[in-house]
A protein has these predicted regions:
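Bacterial N-terminal signal peptides
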Residues: 10-20
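Early exported N-terminus immediately downstream of N-terminal targeting peptides
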Residues: 29-104
Length: 215
């Protein structure tokens, strides 16, 4: 997978919250659920005062909060670790969920702040019981259309995103492949160490060369 496509996976999930404003195909409850946090995201991105460097921490905290409301990071973690999830202790599971959520939230914010006027249009929505898929296409400023599907499920009293599929590539499957490779060639403890290092580098805006765990 190319770096551009890897970055696009997280960018697409980030854009889900700031681009779901126009209507293409008729929107149903899952799409409506995604819309709930849109106004606050747009407000944070469009507020000149909040965009000031001195308020960076506040702005990013707001955007991370929105991401946390829209995505089911625990479910994403379970699916990404797959068979390795059940072999972990409750304490290890809790730690990894937090590490994965932190990495995703920070990646989400860093990509979201690169938003450059892309548009989105809906191509459909399907719901089967407590599972749903919202199908969209992101339209770049050059007119290129990128198909993006948001896989969601019903949890408690709302729909939450547990995977993003861009051009047929699943964000969760991408991480699952990386996690499997690291655990297979090294150890679970090494994976945790890399997750911690990656989270720090994303927080500091550092681009790592030749490092695994690329979103």
């Amino acid at each position: 997978m190319t770096p551009l496509r890897r970055g696009g996976l997280v960018l697409a999930s980030a854009l889900a919250l700031v681009l779901l404003t126009g209507r293409g195909a008729t929107a149903g409850p899952p799409t409506d659920q995604l819309r709930e946090s849109i106004d606050r995201a747009l407000q944070a991105l469009g507020d000149p005062d909040l965009r000031k460097e001195v308020r960076t921490r506040e702005r990013r905290a707001t955007l991370r909060g929105i991401a946390n409301e829209a995505f089911d990071f625990e479910e994403m973690t379970k699916r990404a670790l797959a068979r390795h999830w059940h072999g972990r202790t409750p304490a290890e599971q809790k730690e990894f969920v937090q590490l994965f959520a932190d990495l995703m939230e920070r990646s989400y914010v860093s990509k979201l702040e690169l938003y450059a006027g892309e548009k989105i249009r809906y191509t459909g929505e399907s719901v089967e019981g407590e599972q749903a898929t919202v199908r969209t296409k992101i339209v770049t400023k050059q007119g290129t259309e990128i198909p993006v599907d948001y896989r969601m499920h019903w949890r408690g009293d709302r729909w939450l995103v547990y995977d993003v599929v861009i051009e047929g590539i699943s964000l969760v499957a991408n991480y699952r492949s990386q996690f499997n490779a690291i655990i297979r060639t090294s150890t679970y403890q090494e994976l945790v160490a890399r997750m911690k290092t990656k989270a720090i580098s994303v927080a500091e805006g550092v681009t790592e060369k030749g490092t695994a765990l690329q979103p």
